[in-house]
């Protein structure tokens, strides 16, 4: 689960500034703990535990602190009037990765972002093997030997796959320093309009500056301000509330992270909340850094419309009370909103996209960071190849070639299957969701690894689906058949209509 919009203390369905933020996934400890029932109360002083309200917890949330990188950036000089080879709009991980790789080939690049030095504010979680494949292990500041999934009070799954938290400052510093070494120029502004000509585009910024570029890359997340869509946009939404906190203690194994905890025993004394959770369930995602420092996040996997953030906060407080977790202080909190699924943008179109604006979030899980970082070389190489060819290309020809490499038919078919999975998850209540993931994590690791990391393509996904069906209980099979028939028909129709 990986892309989010973050606001200080409210979740708002708004367009982000340039760049994207990402939401981490959710895991848990290897042993089942019986926490019993305890009574808690709000206390004066640093330790707070609340019943029935998130207000006391939110009182611990500090004012938003914006941390910036401490080095000078080479700024774009508009007086020269040069046409850069590539203008990257958005300074998130994907945008900087493409800027870095295109500039390494000797092409001129301008990165445009309202806050180019700002360290990304969100907690990114990734499977360690994903970052290892990209030589980014030095950008993880914490790792766990594995993860765990709690299906219910009696069933837990050990996931023998290392997991890590991204060191946001290190990753951005590493990318920015390479960009600077390669000659990338930076412009601190927001692009409000793009005007296209035959061989170049003009980016109009909110500071009155116009930047000319041969290729424009939209890496602004979910703003969809530059990349165009021509179909109704009706995604599912993953919504979460998380805190990085100092606690008196917590019950989790510090060597494991909690990927999903679907237990609801913390709601047994709250009939209304228990019924709401049964209809649209939430789970706990936790990254324990030590015995008293932990990241905790309550997450709605996918819903349409998305759950209200105050509903999720209320569920989180009830869970923490039940687990006996007393929060002493909160270093940071985050409100996560991840649009999942929905249509792809118009393919092709003049502006090239990557990340959320290009429909790259995993429709079934919300993951995106590793996927977009892995796609950055694909986009960069396509740009380098066509800008470096001897034959001159029009702007439309260039962008068509890049979009084709970013979304080949194999990737489009893969995404269609993932959307099918999302459509089923949207219809599952808590008992059905538990049965689904009980079967999912019983699969051979190569199947659930590949599904979560977008490494399976349509032929393998069909085998994955059949294997999941065979591992499911009879009740779950019936649910998949009844709730999945219409999504399956829609998927098949879309696959048949999508041609090379």
Curated annotation (Swiss-Prot):
Q: Which GO terms describe its biological process?
A: carotene biosynthetic process; ubiquinone biosynthetic process; xanthophyll biosynthetic process
Protein's UniProt keywords contain DNA-binding = no
Which residues, if any, are the signal sequence? none
Could you tell me the EC number(s) of this protein?
5.5.1.19
Query: Per its UniProt entry, what is the enzyme's top EC class, as one word?
Result: isomerase
Q: InterPro entries from the xrefs?
A: FAD/NAD-bd_sf (IPR036188), Lycopene_cyclase_b/e (IPR010108)
Transit peptide, residues from-to: 1-81
Q: Which UniProt keywords apply?
A: Carotenoid biosynthesis, Chloroplast, Isomerase, NAD, Plastid, Transit peptide
Q: In which pathway does it act?
A: Carotenoid biosynthesis; beta-carotene biosynthesis; Carotenoid biosynthesis; beta-zeacarotene biosynthesis
**An MF annotation (GO) of this entry:** lycopene beta cyclase activity
Q: Does the keyword Aminoacyl-tRNA synthetase apply?
A: no
Amino acids binding NAD(+): 86-114
- The domain of life is Eukaryota
Q: Which Gene3D superfamilies match?
A: FAD/NAD(P)-binding domain
Primary residence: plastid
Q: Could you tell me which SUPFAM superfamilies the record lists for this protein?
A: FAD/NAD(P)-binding domain
Q: Which family does this protein fall into?
A: Belongs to the lycopene cyclase family.
Q: What does this protein do?
A: Catalyzes the double cyclization reaction which converts lycopene to beta-carotene and neurosporene to beta-zeacarotene.
NCBIfam families xref list: carotene-cycl
> What is the protein name for this chain?
Lycopene beta cyclase, chloroplastic
């Amino acid at each position: 689960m990986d892309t989010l919009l973050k606001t200080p203390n409210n979740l708002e369905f708004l367009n982000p500034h340039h760049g994207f933020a990402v939401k981490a996934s959710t895991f848990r400890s290897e042993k089942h703990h019986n926490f019993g029932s305890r009574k808690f109360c709000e206390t004066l002083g640093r330790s707070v535990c609340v019943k029935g309200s998130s207000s006391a917890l939110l009182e611990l949330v500090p004012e938003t602190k914006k941390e910036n990188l401490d080095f000078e950036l080479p700024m774009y000089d508009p007086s020269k009037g040069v046409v850069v080879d590539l203008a990257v709009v958005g300074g998130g991980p994907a945008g900087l990765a493409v800027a870095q790789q295109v500039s390494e080939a000797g092409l001129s690049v301008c990165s445009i972002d309202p806050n180019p030095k700002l360290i990304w504010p969100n907690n990114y979680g990734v499977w360690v093997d994903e970052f290892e494949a990209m030589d980014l292990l030095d950008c993880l500041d914490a790792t766990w030997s594995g993860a765990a999934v709690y299906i219910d009070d009696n069933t837990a799954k050990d996931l023998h796959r290392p997991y890590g938290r991204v060191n946001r400052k290190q990753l951005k510093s590493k990318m920015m320093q390479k960009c600077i070494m390669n000659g990338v120029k930076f412009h601190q502004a927001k692009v409000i309009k793009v005007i296209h000509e035959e061989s170049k585009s003009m980016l109009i910024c909110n500071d009155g500056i116009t930047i000319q570029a041969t290729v424009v890359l939209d890496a602004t997340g979910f703003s969809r301000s530059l990349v165009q869509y021509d179909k109704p946009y009706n995604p599912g939404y993953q919504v979460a509330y998380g805190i990085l906190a100092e606690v008196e203690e917590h019950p989790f194994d510090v060597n494991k992270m909690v990927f999903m905890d679907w237990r609801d025993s913390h709601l047994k004394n709250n009939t209304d909340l228990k019924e709401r959770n049964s209809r649209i369930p939430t789970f706990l995602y936790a990254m324990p850094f030590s015995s008293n420092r932990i990241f905790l996040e309550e997450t709605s996997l996918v819903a349409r419309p998305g759950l209200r953030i105050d509903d999720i906060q209320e569920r989180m407080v009830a869970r923490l009370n039940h687990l006996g977790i007393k929060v002493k202080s909160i270093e940071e909190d985050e409100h996560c909103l991840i649009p999942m699924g929905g249509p792809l943008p118009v393919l092709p179109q003049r502006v090239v996209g990557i990340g959320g604006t290009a429909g790259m979030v995993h429709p079934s899980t919300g993951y995106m960071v590793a996927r977009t970082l892995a796609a950055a070389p694909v986009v960069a190489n396509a740009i380098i190849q066509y800008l470096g060819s001897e034959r001159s290309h029009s702007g439309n020809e260039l962008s068509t070639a890049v979009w084709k490499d970013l979304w080949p038919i194999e990737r489009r078919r893969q995404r269609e299957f993932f959307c099918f999975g999302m459509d089923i998850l949207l219809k599952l209540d808590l008992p059905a969701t538990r049965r689904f993931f009980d079967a999912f994590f019983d699969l051979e690791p190569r199947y659930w690894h590949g599904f979560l990391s977008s490494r399976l393509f349509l032929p393998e996904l069909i085998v994955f689906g059949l294997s999941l069906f065979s591992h499911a209980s009879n009740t779950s099979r019936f649910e998949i058949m009844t709730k999945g028939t219409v999504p399956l028909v829609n998927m098949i129709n879309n696959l048949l209509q999508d041609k090379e």
